[in-house]
């Protein structure tokens, strides 16, 4: 099977590349190994989009990129799948519902007539001399071969590039985004949680809970006034 563009990886970068190519009229195939689009936002339940807004000392979120990123953020908010942005230190992030993001991503891709999305699909091999000429895919055990004119590897770990034996390059350490541990808390009294966190910042060990904080959080579980989400850097 021939196509104009093959995009490997259905996360934010892959979705943007595939939709942009399809909107230009290119016959595009988007391959995603999981059962939904969205990348780590859906597969790993990373419930906030970081990098959508400029890093600023001043308050007030400013979009870093207009066009498709702004459109996708607006679609999330309109669909009730996101709210914000929310300020976290110098960062502005957009909290979202992972299932809601998957739904909006699916709708966005579905609007493109020349875009074919293949979920539960992995790349098995890449063939070519000096460049990739064909790619073998497996969708739940069914193998197919694609011959694309252009390939975008948005897998997150250069999966196709590695299979092809091509060279890779990485930005210097000081230019890489630091990893974050994302988690959600439910049925927590937010005021008590904020108080405990503020107290922890002034202790000798940030990992040591301030006196009484465990009791306050435990008591909050029983009252459960509302849910909260936090991001730990």
Description of each model-found segment:
Residues 10, 139, 155-156, 164:
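Glycine-rich, N-terminal phosphate-binding loop of Rossmann-like dinucleotide-binding domains
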Residues 127-145:
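Conserved beta-strand-loop-beta-strand element in the redox core of flavoprotein oxidoreductases
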